[in-house]
Amino acid sequence: MPEITISMAAGRTQEQKIGMMRDITQALVKNLGVDADNVVIQINEAPLYHKMKGGKTFVERAAAAKK
């Protein structure tokens, strides 16, 4: 039973997350030959101020991109 955990910054819509999980499920069915009922996917979301890349929080990066 494949179990996939996705860690990502918060901010995507419920529809986007569900679509992503469905696509991943289908990719596992196609490429691993597993039954979709055996695929488990979990999303762990973090607030943008709890994630950092290149020494800047995602909030800081978003603000800089708007300038």
Predicted segment positions?
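A domain-level signal for the structural core that forms small-molecule/cofactor-binding pockets
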Residues: 2-67
